[in-house]
Amino acid sequence: MAVVAAAAATGSTTRSGGGGGEGTRSGRKKPPPPPLQERVPLGRRAAWAWRLAGLAVLLLLLALLALRLLRHHGGAGGDAGVWRVALVCEAWFAALCALNVSAKWSPVRFVTRPENLVAEGRTPSTTAAEYGELPAVDMLVTTADPALEPPLVTVNTVLSLLALDYPRAGERLACYVSDDGCSPLTCHALREAAGFAAAWVPFCRRYGVAVRAPFRYFSSSSSPESGGPADRKFLDDWTFMKDEYDKLVRRIKNTDERSLLRHGGGEFFAEFLNVERRNHPTIVKTRVSAVMTNAPIMLNMDCDMFVNNPQAVLHAMCLLLGFDDEASSGFVQAPQRFYDALKDDPFGNQMECFFKRFISGVQGVQGAFYAGTGCFHRRKAVYGVPPNFNGAEREDTIGSSSYKELHTRFGNSEELNESARNIIWDLSSKPMVDISSRIEVAKAVSACNYDIGTCWGQEVGWVYGSLTEDILTGQRIHAMGWRSVLMVTEPPAFMGSAPIGGPACLTQFKRWATGQSEIIISRNNPILATMFKRLKFRQCLAYLIVLGWPLRAPFELCYGLLGPYCILTNQSFLPKASEDGFSVPLALFISYNTYNFMEYMACGLSARAWWNNHRMQRIISVSAWTLAFLTVLLKSLGLSETVFEVTGKDKSMSDDDDNTDGADPGRFTFDSLPVFIPVTALAMLNIVAVTVGACRVAFGTAEGVPCAPGIGEFMCCGWLVLCFFPFVRGIVWGKGSYGIPWSVKLKASLLVAMFVTFCKRN
């Protein structure tokens, strides 16, 4: 693990100890300071309208379950087993619906007031420029693979962070980059970027640049017009910065990794390649930053995100400092937003409705989930300290019990223990005059074996043992009694790149689902955190919804197979159109989709976006979630191990977008990954079932069969064919990357043949 620290501006990275008012110095009572944030619940009428709509869907699901229990089976000659399978699946869907109603019951949003972020002992007459002693912030950036995450992507992220607006930024902001791939190219690119930052940061602040990632700024603005002396000065500076950035890009792109290893630092990189790669990136950055700058606030960022709102830190401080009780804001999470996002979200991974509806509802309980990037953490919360902690002992002697506990939790580094002690007990840290004096200490605490025998990775730092450590870490913080806040700003605080194409999207969803499944079956299950810790019950239910995504796979897959099975075996699992009970599943189908559609409309999204997300939910469930479920099942049986899969980032940030050649980025692409086999097979199976059923109806062979499939079964198959239409097109018309490979078609055909054979025997 290569770790690089950079100052936010030229000069040293001297730290001040953090904020804290001195109180009223005179006997005269001061007026209360203006609020830094405002809690805005959803209007009562709107809130109850959404609640009743959700309850209506839930009641229809319960009515369908009652219908199943009362009828017991599909009628004379019907297969009771089919109805039992349907009953189990529908019971699962009803449970998920109840959890969703609970999570969205009390939606809340917070409005920040950075203009009120003024000096200690704030008064209404204090100007907004007098910020006082705001806490320092350590900004932690993670990258893993120089091929999938090009160095220029990381460079733009770092440059945008260094240019953030913050009082005395050179003293209070520090940026750390950890490269889990230990790439000499990434380290070289950051060294090159350091010189460019000396000119870029002042340029951004002088002219109030809104978007401070150079690749985005120069790609979205043409050469400005000059209309006077001031404009002429800006034009000259703009041209100079554009030329310097172009030179930086060329230097980074033209660098050869082998030449870096041969000249200037080869031994250094060889050492890290052999040793440090095994380290855990986020934990390492936490320890390294602790012994170097030890800011009480940490910002965690993925390498493919950049600052889109230069006042993002000030907005975060409004939420971290704006509550009477620190427990109200253990961390502040910014929703994920994407630049150059494809219109109408064709791959269902922009998650706008999830943040606007689901997470705003969770905010009314214990707060937003930690999403892994764009999050401001209290270092105290990351260290596993409960809110409002008051240490019983504050002895300064090394032999005290408090120091012994620190050694047990944080390891044997005296410097790290001292920094942890200052954070835990809100003590002032000594300003760092020269961070180079801590380089050797930083190397020691970043060693591979440092956390052995300590609490790192369990009770301290980011939690080990899951591919979705972000959710697990956030849950642990909530379980200690902390709350969290979703920070919604205009413009959005950070922007990132969303994967495009079938392979990248489904790989990402599979990785998430695998990690979520591992949490569900581990001792970190949220149910245990509610029983034995301080995780609130409704927050636990919200976690179960997200962690239970992959568990939906077997139920949705079984339910999706019921329609083809019943058509192929001349049975039914839904009431006939002529029966009284037919209105229940029909009303459920209409009401659920209408409710879901109205959620997207309320979020300002289009009908096409709703449909794209709906169909992707069906595709993801049958493909990525199914494979994730099987992966974790095999791991629990000791037959396999999970592997972290890096998702490729948008290389337009690195100016390597020359290979578009007219391609349609919103169209589904395929490769030979196993994740495509289940959906391809189910799409084929539904087409076969509809064809067989239509032939029976046309030739009258289904007449006289009391339990023959009805319109409900045909609607289910037809609906799935519509949802899987990208795969149908890939099977029939697709060519190149838009066509499903023959290897996938053959494997899917074999599965279909096996299922049809099974149906004939039944």
UniProtKB/Swiss-Prot annotation:
One of its GO terms (molecular function) is cellulose synthase (UDP-forming) activity. Residues 1-15 have a biased composition (Low complexity). Residues 1-39 are annotated as: Disordered. Its EC number is 2.4.1.-. It holds the Pfam family Cellulose_synt. One of its GO terms (biological process) is plant-type cell wall organization or biogenesis. The keyword Secreted does not apply. The active site is at 180, 470. It comes from the Eukaryota. Gene3D superfamilies: Spore Coat Polysaccharide Biosynthesis Protein SpsA, Chain A. GO terms for cellular component: Golgi membrane. Belongs to the glycosyltransferase 2 family. Plant cellulose synthase-like H subfamily. Thought to be a Golgi-localized beta-glycan synthase that polymerize the backbones of noncellulosic polysaccharides (hemicelluloses) of plant cell wall. This is Cellulose synthase-like protein H2. It comes from Oryza sativa subsp. indica. The lineage of its organism: Eukaryota, Viridiplantae, Streptophyta, Embryophyta, Tracheophyta.
